[in-house]
C-alpha cells in the first residue's frame, strides 16, 4: 500500500489560502481543532492524476517561522517534526500577488527545511488591473522551485498545481540560504546571545 500523500497549504494571513484549499478539496473536507488547543484544523481530500489521493492541510496563517502566536506555533511544530503523522510530503506556499516580497520570507524559510515546495502566486487576475507583471521563469531560477500564477476566481493554475503536487518528487529541495558561505562562528556567537531566535 502506498504512503498517503500529504500536502500542507501555508501562507501569510489574507493570501487566499482557503480559496485554494476549497478549489483542491471541493466538498471533501472537515473542520476540527488541533489536540488540546482551540486553533482550527482544516483538512480535506484531493483527487489527483493516476488515481492518487492527497490529504490536504490548510494550516493557520503565519508570517514567518518565528512564532509569535498559538496559530504560528502549530505551523512550526508540524514542519519541524518529521515524525508527525501530518508532516507534509510537499508544501504549497500561497502568496498574494500584491505583497509578494513580504510573502517570500516565509517561502524561503520553508524551503530551507528541505521540504519539497511550490510557490503559488494567488489573485493573479488583478495583475493587469494593477499594472503588475511577474516573470515566473526568473523567480523559478532564483528560488529553485516551480512558480504558479493562480486565480481562484478564474480557476487559473489549478490543473498545474495538481500536476506539480502529483509529481512533487521532481521538485528541488535545495536551500535558499547558502549555508556554505555563512560565517559559522558569527552565527554561533549570535545563538549564544539569542538562544531562542532562529537564524533568520
Give residue ranges: language-model regions.
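Canonical P-loop GTPase G-domain recognition
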Residues: 125-178
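Extracytoplasmic
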Residues: 182-200
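Conserved nucleotide-binding/hydrolysis micro-motifs of P-loop NTPases
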Residues: 36, 61-64, 97-100, 123-128, ...
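Conserved C-terminal guanine-recognition region of P-loop GTPase G domains, centered on the G4
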Residues: 47-51, 74-146
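Alpha-helical scaffold segments in soluble metabolic enzymes
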Residues: 19, 23, 74-77, 160, ...
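Amphipathic alpha-helical transducer elements in NTP-driven molecular machines
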Residues: 36, 40, 69-72, 76, ...
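Conserved G1/Walker A P-loop phosphate-binding module
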Residues: 1-68
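Catalytic cores of large soluble enzymes that bind and process phosphate-bearing ligands
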Residues: 31, 67, 98, 131, ...
Amino acid at each position: 500500500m502506498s504512503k498517503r500523500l500529504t500536502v500542507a497549504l501555508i501562507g501569510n494571513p489574507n493570501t487566499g489560502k482557503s480559496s485554494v484549499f476549497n478549489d483542491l478539496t471541493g466538498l471533501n473536507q472537515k473542520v476540527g481543532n488541533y489536540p488540546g488547543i482551540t486553533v482550527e484544523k482544516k483538512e480535506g481530500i484531493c483527487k489527483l492524476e493516476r488515481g492518487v489521493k492527497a490529504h490536504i492541510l490548510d494550516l493557520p496563517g503565519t508570517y514567518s517561522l518565528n512564532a509569535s502566536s498559538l496559530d504560528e506555533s502549530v505551523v512550526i511544530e508540524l514542519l519541524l517534526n518529521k515524525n508527525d503523522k501530518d508532516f507534509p510530503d510537499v508544501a504549497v506556499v500561497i502568496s498574494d500577488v500584491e505583497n509578494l516580497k513580504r510573502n517570500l520570507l516565509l517561502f524561503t524559510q520553508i524551503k530551507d527545511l528541505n521540504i519539497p515546495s511550490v510557490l503559488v502566486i494567488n489573485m493573479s487576475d488583478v495583475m493587469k488591473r494593477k499594472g503588475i507583471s511577474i516573470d515566473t521563469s526568473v523567480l523559478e531560477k532564483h528560488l529553485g522551485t516551480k512558480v504558479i500564477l493562480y486565480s481562484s476566481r478564474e480557476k487559473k493554475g489549478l490543473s498545474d498545481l495538481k500536476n506539480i503536487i502529483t509529481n512533487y518528487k521532481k521538485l528541488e529541495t535545495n536551500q535558499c540560504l547558502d549555508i556554505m558561505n555563512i560565517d559559522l562562528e558569527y552565527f554561533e556567537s549570535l545563538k549564544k546571545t539569542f538562544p531562542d531566535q532562529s537564524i533568520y
